[in-house]
């Protein structure tokens, strides 16, 4: 999960130490974030995109973050100095996040080292393309690979007993 992983990256601590073991929990915001250490070392710091950490992005000179999980189309963002005050922006979330990251790079202090974290929504379900790509492959027939319906019966024990099946855990029916 991205939120517990992000909490581990930000704090340098395992989930059981930083408090963010699953989505419903919140990171222990009394823990030091690496962005705070970078600021103390003279870095300019920024985060753009998905945050979803149940606390303000501390240790960042600039942030432009999605509300909660974020929406693919016309998402709402909160920005530096206005944490929790979300404003809707028109467009596709990947384009908007990328544009905000580039804008930060263009206006940052060029005399200081910097750290920019860009967290895209795109890796998170439900996967929605930009409207400009929705029908790009509408007339293309993609054949399923021969192993698509493989039941793993003839595979080794590790593959045979694996828990993550496409049908049960990756919601194949919905995604197809």
Language model segments and positions:
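Formylglycine-dependent sulfatase
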Residues: 1-176
């Amino acid at each position: 999960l991205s939120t517990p992983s992000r909490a581990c990256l930000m704090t340098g601590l395992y989930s059981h130490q930083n408090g963010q073991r699953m989505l419903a929990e919140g990171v222990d915001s009394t823990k030091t974030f690496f962005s705070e250490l970078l600021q103390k070392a003279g870095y300019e710091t920024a985060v753009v995109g998905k945050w979803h950490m149940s606390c303000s992005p501390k240790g960042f000179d600039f942030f432009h973050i999605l509300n909660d999980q974020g929406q693919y189309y016309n998402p709402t963002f909160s920005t530096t100095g206005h944490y929790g005050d979300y404003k809707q922006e028109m467009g596709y979330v990947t384009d908007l996040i990328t544009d905000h990251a580039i804008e930060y790079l263009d206006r940052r202090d060029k005399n200081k080292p910097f750290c920019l974290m860009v967290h895209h929504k795109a890796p998170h379900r439900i996967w929605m393309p930009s409207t400009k790509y929705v029908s790009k492959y509408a007339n293309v027939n993609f054949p399923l690979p021969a192993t698509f319906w493989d039941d793993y019966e003839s595979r080794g024990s590790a593959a045979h007993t694996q828990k993550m099946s496409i049908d049960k855990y990756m919601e194949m029916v919905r995604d197809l």
